[in-house]
Amino acid sequence: MRGMGNMNNMMKQMQKMQKDMAKAQEELKDLTVTGTAGGEMVSVVADGHKNIIDVIIKEEVVDPDDVEMIQDLVLAATNDALKKVDELVSSKMGKFTQGMNMPGMF
């Protein structure tokens, strides 16, 4: 029955890891990153769950005759913010899958 002790220990470790992962995911919602474009003329703030929570456009970049430029800057800043969220999630959650060969996981 020696193997049962190892199995119980493994189950406890898995439960702890699951609890730690849930806590880390919960913490992500409180973390924010800021993506920028155009020399910080446009900033987009996102939380760790990829929700865009703020868009800041500096007044001097607003040109009614060039709306397309603002759209491009907002798009670039949003993509920058989402890339930073991916990096944040990877650094926070990657430790849970470290050493496991699980493609597509963090």
Curated annotation (Swiss-Prot):
InterPro entries: YbaB-like_sf (IPR036894), YbaB/EbfC (IPR004401)
Pfam family for this entry, one: YbaB_DNA_bd
Membrane-crossing segments per the record: none
GO CC, any one term: cytosol
Cell compartment(s), UniProt: Cytoplasm, Nucleoid
Oligomer and partners: Homodimer.
The protein's name in its UniProt record: Nucleoid-associated protein Exig_0019
Organism: Exiguobacterium sibiricum (strain DSM 17290 / CCUG 55495 / CIP 109462 / JCM 13490 / 255-15)
